[in-house]
Amino acid sequence: MKRKAILLIVFALMLQVVVGCESNHANGQVQTKQHADFTFDVKPETFEVFVEKDGVKERASEPLPARKVANVQKGEQGITWSYPEDKLDVSLQKKEDHLQITLTSTGTESFSWPTVKGPSYMLPLGEGKWIPADDREWQSFFKEESLTFAESFSMRFFAVNKNKYALLYVVDNLFNSTVDFAVDPTISFTFSHEFPTINSDKTYGFRLYVTDNDPVSIAGVYKDYIKEKGELLTLAEKAKANPDVEKLYGAPHFYLWNKSFLTAEDVKWRALKTKLDANFIGWMEQHLQSSEDGKESIQQFREIQKQDYVADYQKRAIISGFNYALRSREFYNPKLFTNVDEKTKELIGKGIDKLTEAQLYDLNKRLLKSVLQDAVPPIEKWGNADSTDLLKDMKAAGITNAWIGLPDWTAAYMKPAFIQQANDKGYLIASYDSYHSIHKEENQDWNTAIFEDKSLYENATITKKNGEKKAGFLQRGRLLNPTLSLPSVKQRMDEIMSNDVAFNSWFIDVDAAGDFNDDYSPEHTTTEAQDMKAKLARMDYIRDEKKLVVGSETGNDFASRSISFAHGIETPVIKWADSDMRKNKQSPYYVGGYWSPAGEIPERYKKQVPIKEEYQHVYIDPAYSLPLYKLVYNNSVITSHHWEWGSLKIKGEVGTRMLKELLYNVPPLYHVDRKMWDAEQELIMNYLKVWSPFHKKAVQQEMTDYRVLSEDRLVQKAVYGDDLQVIANFSQQDFTYENQVVKARSALIIDGKNKQTFLAPAQ
């Protein structure tokens, strides 16, 4: 009876806490402020926790099925107990400003706690979301959904909105954890943690805070936690180490698709036919046998000899063939290329196998020029329309700062002058890079998966718990263990930077996305925590040793000190598993494929498509969006959209996304080639004339306040520093705020005494 009575005891402990974060604009900083004390009760047999503040009692965690309890110890600072059948120890300890909850495995492989319920939630999914528990669209979206915590949550917390206050759980251990949703009758979710056998850390836990029921308070408490941990590093501090960071201020983000030596516009097609003799065509055919599109190119080389014109599709096929062959180390044939200049002879004399990639491309261009002669311009002018000429046009249009990304570094080797010109114009110029997947069979169009050390595929790839190798992106190849990658990172970066290409920025896929893996390979067993540290180490190496402004995918905040910008927080990859978007090419929602003719933007990035109503509600609708990430990291990490979902990608949402970019201080992201620039320049520049000067000022300050101003949540206000405000009206009606009319579908920017209105386009 005595033991049973112990199990039924409700332990109540007084906890003096900081429970709120009130907005205070003094000195442009978010200030925390003490509120009232709270008490908590816990029932060990069900692990049910209650919190009481100002006479209002709320359940902080739903009860588990009753279980056997042992070793209950109550002290002045807290309470501990064990679940002997679960092989788990539990500790709740009183701290100055929170309740520390720690769960330690003494043998269990996994445990699920807490399960939380509330009228609504504020979750750092991407930038941040407000999720009503009874919302049907969110219920549909979360039905049977399980999210990997480290990957899906941009920051290490979740908040439950109760009737009078919010409960904020800050997660101590972000690894090996999932969040599993239930939706009947309303949304709730459970945090689950696995204790891998290869990991000696057998604990997970939380800090539980009580704070005001608004995003500014929630983000403020978390920001204090980040400061306490020494994890906050501002852009200004990053710029002290590399002044180029400041080039991100007011900078839109562009991916330029100029990955071609020659374009159709470079060629005089009538003259070309006279230069293509049988020997040269035969040589080209040999090179194109291994190309995916080689058969089509070969056919069109032959067909145009019979015609007095060249159709556009034939031009594309022939240009594709040239561009493929120009990348080959076997392109030179001394019997075929006999009329070469002195520079070409000099390059040949160095030994083709010893040439850098940039030198190889220079040689091959010169060889082709010696055959095509006046059918093409001087090699310095090849591809200018989509590279150097485009940069000139962007600068002339008024783009002062810009981040420019290339699909991979070979585009720089094709035209090194383009990289230097971007530098000279004050732009940041970067290449996309990745150390995630590794392929056994090499594909030059996926060169990030090619590594000089060929032993890595067998000796440095990740093994799952069941002994199988973990597949790479798109189920191709394998995943490279990041703890074994740094020598290859150094080799690749040394090679790229030795090619006389003046990159000043770098974009690394995956590393800031929270995609961590345990590796059960006996030769190189690795935990998720070690995986994360290795990813941070290679980003830090590129940042510090190569002096590049580093960005990465998503930008989850474990990487906030390593990166200056990220792509994916604002609009993540939308529903990867939806076949209508990814596989069904007849669907109006099909986003397009990855392939494109050389030098053109792939449909995946340029094709404008609508999204399903459910996804619009979840991913785009401003009524459910919160700037949680910006309230913590606005002047620390610059975040934009995932490159699959650039600013112009979603049909019918272009204007809404512009307004949100202003409200949340987000750089627009565009995919650009000559055709796209000519078509969209007016739209882009009308927007950037407002956005760029605003961002340049706002990004150097904290977001100090955020408010929802209308009942439908379609009018919202954000404040940066002391006196820079944005009021965005996403609705179809004018809205009056403090005697000022904010027009429908507009953003009102108030900078001290200066006011400016941006009207969103009807797109």
Question: Which residues are covered by each model-predicted region?
Answer:
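Positively charged n-region of N-terminal signal peptides that target proteins for export
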Residues: 1-5
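Bacterial N-terminal signal peptides
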Residues: 9-17
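Carbohydrate-recognition beta-sandwich/jelly-roll modules
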Residues: 27-401, 421-429, 433-435, 550, ...
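Active-site-proximal substrate-binding groove within the catalytic cores of carbohydrate-active enzymes
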Residues: 42-51, 188-207, 211-216, 265-277, ...
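Aromatic- and acidic-residue-enriched carbohydrate-binding clefts of CAZyme catalytic domains
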Residues: 358, 362-373, 445-479, 518-529
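Long, K/E/R/D-enriched contiguous segments that form extended
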Residues: 391-405, 413, 421-428, 433-437, ...
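Aromatic- and acidic-residue-enriched segments that line the glycan-binding/catalytic groove
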Residues: 424, 438-464, 564-575
